[in-house]
Amino acid sequence: MRKSVIAGNWKMHMTCAEAKSYLEEFIPLIKNIRDDRKVVIAPPFTAISTFSKHSDFDYLDISSQNIHWEDEGAFTAEISPKMLIEHGVSYAIVGHSEPRKYFSESDEQINKRAVFAQCSGLTPIVCVGETLEQRERGEADRVITRQVEQGLENTDPSNLIVAYEPIWAIGTGKTCEAKDANNICSLIRKLIGFDDVIIQYGGSVKPNNIDEIMSMSDIDGVLVGGASLDPNSFARIANYQ
């Protein structure tokens, strides 16, 4: 049985002091979380050490928001797996639509990050998703297929999470219909060819829609943005029914 992974991506939010206060409020709210799920938070790099000092790793894991494909070198503004592992990080988000958009990350670069994350002992959370224009032109399946085939080449599906995040639903308040999201997640599972791969949905996930999203057969978790910044909202998402 696939374990549910409920992940929060804080993006460029929260200082170390704010992260500490958040954890003090959040951890008691998830202490009785069910054994069939895992909670992961991806704080800014500066707050990762706060997590490693103050979080309880039995039910809360740390993710980075990106990762480089080398352990060291002249790569300004990048961060390596060994730097992250030293602080208790066990997951790494790669291929999020924001680096794809703002820094022109290619599927080839995303693949290098994902492969090296696995080689270093981390579990990559690889994001895929189509734009509104691509969706309206009926190209969603083709775009997702390309991103999966190129971005996941030579990865180990037994140590992998794929997050389907329709770009038009991220931070907009618009949520992909649960059945439509499930159909894309089913496509991703078939493309990977491994039934036990964990597939998340991301895009305006909130307490008022989490139960419907998680009732879908091919959705194994969520990657949450804005709603993960509020400890009560994120706890409700983590404790979905």
Swiss-Prot record:
Keywords: Cytoplasm, Gluconeogenesis, Glycolysis, Isomerase. It is found in: Cytoplasm. Homodimer. This is Triosephosphate isomerase. Involved in the gluconeogenesis. Catalyzes stereospecifically the conversion of dihydroxyacetone phosphate (DHAP) to D-glyceraldehyde-3-phosphate (G3P). Substrate binds at N9, W10, K11, G171, S204, G225, G226. InterPro entries: Aldolase_TIM, TIM_sf, TrioseP_Isoase_bac/euk, Triosephosphate_isomerase, Triosephosphate_isomerase_AS. Its EC number is 5.3.1.1. It catalyses: D-glyceraldehyde 3-phosphate = dihydroxyacetone phosphate. Its main location: cytoplasm. One of its GO terms (biological process) is glycolytic process. PROSITE patterns: TIM_1, TIM_2. The active site is at H96, E165. The lineage of its organism: Bacteria, Bacillati, Cyanobacteriota, Cyanophyceae, Synechococcales. The gene is tpiA. The keyword Isomerase applies. It holds the Pfam family TIM. Pathway: Carbohydrate biosynthesis; gluconeogenesis; Carbohydrate degradation; glycolysis; D-glyceraldehyde 3-phosphate from glycerone phosphate: step 1/1. One of its GO terms (cellular component) is cytosol. HAMAP family: TIM_B (MF_00147_B). The keyword S-adenosyl-L-methionine does not apply. GO terms for molecular function: triose-phosphate isomerase activity. Belongs to the triosephosphate isomerase family.
